[in-house]
């Protein structure tokens, strides 16, 4: 039985669109989810896809995150609230569909 990977429901379609278009996607994990997912492991997405973790990068400052300039201020603040402001790291995870 595969473990599940979670996403906010409002992101389901955009994640699937990225996977269809690029073959991979990224997610950011903070606070209690740091360390939960492992490179090379597969997880069940809420919409039924099996997703494989390809790479995990750990950061301490939101400004160090790749594609930071593409994020909204609200997204940056959400990550900062549960990582940088608490003195904790966060993870930037690349994943793809498992074939």
Report each predicted region and the residues it spans.
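Cell-wall polysaccharide-cleaving catalytic domain and substrate-binding groove, primarily
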Residues: 38-42, 92
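Short, flexible surface segments
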Residues: 36-39, 47
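A generic structural signal for short beta-strands and their flanking turns/coil linkers
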Residues: 24, 47-49, 91
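Aromatic- and Lys/Arg-enriched surface recognition patch
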Residues: 55-99
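Compositionally biased, charged N-terminal/linker segments
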Residues: 1-37
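A generic structural signal for short, non-catalytic loop/turn and secondary-structure boundary residues
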Residues: 1, 46, 86-88
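Solvent-exposed, well-ordered amphipathic alpha-helical segments
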Residues: 1-3, 22, 50-52, 96-99
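Short coil-to-beta-strand transition motifs
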Residues: 43-54
């Amino acid at each position: 039985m595969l473990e599940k990977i979670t996403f906010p429901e409002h992101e389901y379609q955009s994640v699937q669109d990225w996977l269809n278009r690029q073959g991979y996607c990224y997610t950011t994990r903070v606070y209690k989810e740091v360390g939960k997912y492992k490179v090379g492991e597969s997880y069940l997405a809420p919409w039924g896809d099996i997703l494989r973790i390809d790479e995990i990068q750990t950061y301490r400052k939101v400004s160090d995150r790749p594609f930071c300039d593409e994020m909204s201020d609200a997204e940056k603040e959400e990550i900062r609230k549960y990582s940088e402001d608490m003195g904790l790291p966060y993870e930037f995870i690349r994943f793809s569909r498992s074939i």
